[in-house]
Amino acid sequence: MKLYLSSYKIGNKPEVLKKWIREHNNKICLIPNSRDVYPDGERKTNGIQADAQELTDLGFDVTVISLKDYFNKKEELSQILESFSAFFVIGGNTFVLRQAMYLSGFDNFLKTKENDPNFLYAGYSAGICVLAKDLHGLDVCDDPNVNPYGIDTMWNGLGYYDYIFLPHYKSDHKETKLIDDSVEYCNKHNIKYKTLRDGDVILDDTNRELER
């Protein structure tokens, strides 16, 4: 599974995504559930549409799928997701996103694609933070107690990294001060982390030895 990990929005490697379209296809599924931390309304909808438009401008044919529509319908969701080879997971609240991935079975679906080089997981902010093995340290910048789905906070991430990502570091972003606080907290508590400035993109893949 190829990974395109951005601090904010598309980031500074759009040519990588354009190359993906040329070599594969332009279908992409946008996952918006980190935004379930916010109430439904025009502002939330407009934000999701703005993310979708950025992908459209690159040449993608975007389908927005809310994992919330498939809670306790894991088989149905898996069948739908099989028609996509690329996903874009947007920013919001990491803990809410993790819960949505669990309740819908999206996390288990990803596991079936780990060794597939023709599968792309792209995302930014919460969409990359959720990839860590353990989410402790992210609670400084994301509220872990927000509970839109009625289940307990999940501190285990997807398990692809043994450190957390801290996006928006030293950036022109409203959360950059919270990221500074997160860095301080992680240093104090010996939590491993990697900072990204807005614009930064990390390219990686999961076809390697992973510690669960």
Q: What is the predicted role of each segment?
A:
Residues 99-102, 107-116, 120-169:
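Class I SAM-dependent methyltransferase SAM-binding "motif I" and its flanking Rossmann-like core
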Residues 1-24, 34-46, 54, 137-212:
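C-terminal and late-domain segments of enzyme folds
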Residues 62-119:
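Flexible gly/pro-rich beta->alpha loop and the following alpha-helix that scaffold active-site loops
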